[in-house]
């Protein structure tokens, strides 16, 4: 145990120290019995012993929270890379984005001054109350796992309410997404990013007035209120990323697709808002490759196979755009298990 870790542990209340010891024991038992790394069970046990443990472990950290329907894991890894130019960063390695996974991550990264935390959309309000993030990154909002999440407009309203409780928090929001814009519109500190919004089927009406959303190229506005697309501070094109004060730099990524250029732009904007040097942040996001199995390339016989993941219509639209039209073949596998949602009716909305 490092001196810094020991000093940090000594400052914690007895209940929290007991919770950490129990979590460590659970991880050890899980690994010894071949049942996995034990991070999740450790997080669950720690939270049961000390319900305030997330808040206690996050205290003193400069934290970026990343959320959205699609791109959370990728953007979190990019944000981690960009913040890494400032110092040590703790983040989930496996995309476990609910309370137990977040607690497990914070447990293992006690001494890191920075945290980049992926958070499920439903959990953002109470997680933000616990970790008090310096930056909240809002990527996109669309239908996802209807048997668990429900109506997306409910998520938008909950996010809006959660943001209102943190007036000092910087919100890095995608102004091309109508629902994200609505969630962030009233925030006091917003950095608007034109990160792309190819899927518009879930935002044909204004979330604030119910009137139609009118679109003209990249611009959009509500016919019933003065609610419209804000002017972005950050944006990207086929070659470069552009930011405030005339900043421009080449944007070279290891990941395919326009959506990932948008993810990278939001990650850079978040890191810069927390003090990163822009050029260094851009170079850092370009180092990100495979993300929890996504985008990885596997050799199968004589073929190189790239793995893509999508779990809703918006995600599939982006994934399909990444497929090489000259590829020798395409295999689509559908998982209808609990972690990814048992309601598969959304597949009918994908233009295969």
PLM feature spans:
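Generic secondary-structure signature for well-ordered alpha-helical cores
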Residues: 27-34, 88, 160, 164-168, ...
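Phosphate-binding loop of NTP-binding sites
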Residues: 3-192, 199, 205
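Active-site flanking residues adjacent to catalytic metal/cofactor-binding acidic residues
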Residues: 117, 173-175, 262, 307, ...
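Active-site beta-alpha connecting loops in nucleotide-dependent enzymes
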Residues: 291, 303, 309-352
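Buried hydrophobic packing segments
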Residues: 79, 83, 102-106, 264-274, ...
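Adenine nucleotide phosphate-binding catalytic loops in nucleotide-utilizing enzymes
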Residues: 3-12, 189-314
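Cofactor-binding loop segments of dinucleotide-utilizing enzymes, especially the Rossmann-like FAD-
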Residues: 68-69, 94, 195, 283, ...
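Short N-terminal or domain-adjacent regulatory/targeting segments
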Residues: 38-53, 287-289, 314, 320, ...
């Amino acid at each position: 145990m490092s001196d810094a870790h020991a000093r940090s542990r000594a400052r914690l209340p007895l209940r929290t120290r007991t919770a950490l010891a129990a979590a460590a024991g659970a991880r050890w038992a899980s690994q010894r019995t071949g049942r996995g790394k034990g991070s999740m069970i450790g997080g669950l046990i720690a939270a049961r012993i000390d319900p305030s443990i997330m808040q206690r472990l996050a205290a003193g950290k400069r934290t970026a929270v990343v959320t959205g329907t699609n791109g959370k894991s990728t953007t979190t890894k990019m944000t981690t890379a960009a913040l890494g130019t400032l110092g040590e960063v703790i983040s989930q390695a496996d995309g476990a984005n609910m309370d137990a996974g977040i607690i497990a991550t914070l447990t293992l990264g006690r001494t890191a001054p920075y945290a980049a935390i992926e958070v499920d959309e439903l959990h953002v309000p109470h997680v933000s109350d616990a970790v008090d993030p310096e930056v909240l990154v809002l990527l996109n909002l669309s239908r996802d796992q209807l048997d668990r999440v429900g109506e997306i407009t409910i998520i938008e309203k909950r996010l809006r309410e959660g943001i209102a409780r943190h007036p000092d928090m910087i919100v890095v929001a995608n102004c091309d997404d109508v629902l994200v814009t609505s969630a962030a519109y009233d925030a006091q500190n917003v950095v608007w990013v034109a990160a792309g919004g190819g899927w518009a089927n879930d935002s044909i009406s204004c979330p604030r007035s119910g009137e139609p959303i009118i679109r003209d190229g990249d611009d959009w506005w509500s016919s019933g209120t003065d609610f419209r697309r804000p002017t972005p501070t950050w944006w990207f094109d086929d070659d470069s990323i552009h930011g405030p004060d005339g900043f421009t730099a080449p944007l070279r990524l290891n990941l395919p697709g326009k959506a990932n250029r948008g993810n990278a732009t939001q990650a850079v904007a978040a890191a810069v808002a927390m003090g990163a040097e822009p050029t260094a942040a851009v170079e850092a996001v370009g180092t990100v490759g495979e993300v929890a199995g996504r985008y990885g390339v596997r050799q199968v016989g004589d073929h190189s196979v790239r793995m893509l993941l999508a779990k809703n219509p918006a995600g599939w639209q982006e994934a399909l755009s990444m497929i090489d039209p000259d590829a020798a073949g395409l295999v689509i596998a559908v998982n209808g298990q609990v972690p990814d949602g048992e309601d598969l009716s959304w597949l009918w909305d994908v233009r295969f």
